[in-house]
Amino acid sequence: MGQKVNPNGFRYGVTKKHNTLWYADKKDFADILLQDDKIYRFFNKFTREYLIGKVEIRRNQNGHLSVLVHSAKPGAILGQNGENINKLTQDIQKLLRNKELKLNIEVVNIKNPDLNAIILAEQIAIKLENRAPFRVAQKFAIRNAMKSGAKGIKTQVSGRLNGVDMARSEGYSEGEMKLHTLRQDVDFAMATARTTYGAIGVKVWVSKGEFLDGNGEKNVTTEKN
């Protein structure tokens, strides 16, 4: 079953923390959930520009909204003298139609972007759009991830590869990838490359080892006897 479901959703509440954390009354739940969806879609547009690897949303009982943006280019999000992040704040307030919204955007630096599945998937998609061979694009990402300390990585591209008439899927993997083991820390992401031959789907799985029993933060390497 672990091979068929989204590895992130499979682990939320077990070994992965939810990206959204808040409580709301029943009458307000739908509106707040819709706001979260708009915020996620807003930052998805900047994934490539700012190398955004994760977005977290936190709300307190006073209605204060905090958005944590994990990025490999925090300086680009902040802008000179914080001008860009102020603009992003105003854009979100306008999107949610609430200029009085207490909103705080925090930028978290991603120390190792080569272990982030979202960034790796977007890098492969960019190379495909620049007409790089799909094998080279995947192996480049695999090599960088393994050098950065990944325990395993798996990639897959699907579509009209190299412009052939019949669409197909092709992927590569290296290291361990236990999708059926919930204590295995697996990061998963998808991206789309818009090429002259049509859309090509990209999937990336990154394994960072196994969680210790009762600890959701520290990882250990799995060794085979």
Swiss-Prot record:
Listed A to Z, the keywords are: Ribonucleoprotein, Ribosomal protein, RNA-binding, rRNA-binding
Q: Does the keyword Transferase apply?
A: no
Top-rank taxon, per record: Bacteria
Give an example GO cellular component term for this record: cytosolic small ribosomal subunit
Q: What InterPro entries does the entry give?
A: KH_dom, KH_dom-like_a/b, KH_dom_type_2, KH_sf_prok-type, Ribosomal_S3_C_sf, Ribosomal_uS3_bac-typ, Ribosomal_uS3_C, Ribosomal_uS3_CS
Domain KH type-2, residue spans: 39-109
One Gene Ontology biological process: translation
GO: which molecular function terms?
mRNA binding; rRNA binding; structural constituent of ribosome
Query: What is the role of this chain?
Result: Binds the lower part of the 30S subunit head. Binds mRNA in the 70S ribosome, positioning it for translation.
Q: Which family does it belong to?
A: Belongs to the universal ribosomal protein uS3 family.
Q: How does it assemble?
A: Part of the 30S ribosomal subunit. Forms a tight complex with proteins S10 and S14.
Extract the NCBIfam families matched here.
Answer: rpsC_bact
Name of the protein this chain belongs to: Small ribosomal subunit protein uS3
Q: Which gene encodes it?
A: rpsC
